[in-house]
Amino acid sequence: MRDKGDYLFTSESVSEGHPDKVADRISDTVLDAFLAADPYARVACETLVTTNRIVLAGETRGPSTITREYLAHLARLAVHDIGYEQEGFSWRDAKIDVLLHEQSVDIAVGVDAAGNKDEGAGDQGIMFGYACSETDALMPAPIYYAHLILRRMTELRKIGDARAAGLLPDAKSQVTLRYADGKPVGTTSIVVSTQHEDGMSQDEIKAMLRPLVTELLPDGWMCPDDQFYVNPTGKFVIGGPDGDCGLTGRKIIVDTYGGAAPHGGGAFSGKDPTKVDRSAAYMCRYLAKNVVAAGLATRCTIQVSYAIGVSHPLSVYVDMHGTERDVDHARLETVLRELVNLTPRGIREHLHLNRPIYVPTSAYGHFGREPDDRLGTFTWEKTDLAPALKAAFGR
């Protein structure tokens, strides 16, 4: 995204009932079950969901008390919470196959710490984090509002509110924002596709959703009515895993910054925090957000890279996109390394990641969320590093 000039930028989100998000939810449910039993459990759980079928596959290392029957039960509870009790996909009737097996010893030997050896990364890879001053959450505005629309629709649906009457779990949103001199000033178009009960008309759903969406946006930001597209094909009754097969890890741009920042390619859900695809991406977001919160820049991208079995990052890169305020990039890279231990273990300890905190991340974005000290969730969204960054640069 450009820092100056006039342009349009679009991001999309999907609801927790989208097939890929159902898969993400189940994978993170499995992960949390293992971490609740053993904070040092290893999990890489992939889920496939289709018409009345759920398949769990992958690798784990943890307590034998976590049985396949228990995991199947948890998968049903996850589907029930999302709200699927339909003929083609129901928490009651779906057949569940649990095909998880032990983690490879060849991977474990590179990750486990022994003697004085530091714990290595679980794989090679590159990870990115990003923050900007467009919203209070320090997130890009298009993805922020795309998430907000669907979260609100889901909240109302689950409590039986009339403002979401007849809506079903599967939904998508897409928000196009107009930028003037590099700053968001309003929407030019919004798309909302939502599964619904049979018999509801397109006009009825649009009339129900327009005030809901309008109240979530800043004053004057709502697009013209002819640019507010609701169920553009006219009907969306068959949805969820009965309409499309869902797989873990297929919504990585929705999960992060909506295309406003680079992505290293690794998905998050179902992976324990020894997998730097997840934990290092969380740390990069934490660092970038604190750079912006400290007032050192209004935009910040951070990249790190790792090799399997090697504890320290091979590289740390910072880009403030020309928005820095008397801050040298090389100096900032050094300061970040000094303030935070960027080994896999250091990341997990700093952000307290060895806990069952991942189910809430499985929909509506891993970033831009509110940290909850009681639940221990979204610790990477805290800005507690900002004072140290300010001090390091004499602010």
From Swiss-Prot:
The cofactor required is: Mg(2+); K(+)
Keywords in UniProt for this one? Answer: ATP-binding, Cytoplasm, Magnesium, Metal-binding, Nucleotide-binding, One-carbon metabolism, Potassium, Transferase
Record-linked HAMAP family? S_AdoMet_synth1
DNA-binding in keyword set:
no
* EC number per UniProt: 2.5.1.6
Sequence positions that bind L-methionine: 59, 103, 244, 275
Q: Give the binding site residues for K(+).
A: 46
- Flexible loop: region residues: 103-113
The protein's matches in PROSITE patterns, at most eight in alphabetical order, are given as: ADOMET_SYNTHASE_1 (PS00376), ADOMET_SYNTHASE_2 (PS00377)
> Which InterPro entries does the record match to this protein?
ADOMET_SYNTHASE_CS, S-AdoMet_synt_C, S-AdoMet_synt_central, S-AdoMet_synt_N, S-AdoMet_synthetase, S-AdoMet_synthetase_sfam
Per the entry, the cofactor note is: Binds 2 divalent ions per subunit. Binds 1 potassium ion per subunit.
UniProt: Mg(2+) binding residues: 20
UniProt gene name: metK
Keyword Cytoplasm on entry: yes
Query: What is the protein named?
Result: S-adenosylmethionine synthase
Kindly list the places in or outside the cell where this protein is found, as annotated in its UniProt entry: Cytoplasm
**What does the UniProt function comment say about this protein?**
Catalyzes the formation of S-adenosylmethionine (AdoMet) from methionine and ATP. The overall synthetic reaction is composed of two sequential steps, AdoMet formation and the subsequent tripolyphosphate hydrolysis which occurs prior to release of AdoMet from the enzyme.
- Pathway terms, separated by semicolons: Amino-acid biosynthesis; S-adenosyl-L-methionine biosynthesis; S-adenosyl-L-methionine from L-methionine: step 1/1
Which family does the entry's similarity section mention?
Belongs to the AdoMet synthase family.
Q: Which reaction does it catalyse?
A: L-methionine + ATP + H2O = S-adenosyl-L-methionine + phosphate + diphosphate
Q: Which GO terms describe its molecular function?
A: ATP binding; magnesium ion binding; methionine adenosyltransferase activity
Q: How does it assemble?
A: Homotetramer; dimer of dimers.
Annotated residues that bind ATP are located at 18, 170-172, 235-236, 244, 250-251, 267, 271
Q: Tell me, what's a Pfam family for it? A: S-AdoMet_synt_N
GO cellular-component terms in the record? cytoplasm
Q: Where the protein is mainly located, per its record?
A: cytoplasm
Give the UniProt record's GO annotations in the biological process aspect: one-carbon metabolic process; S-adenosylmethionine biosynthetic process
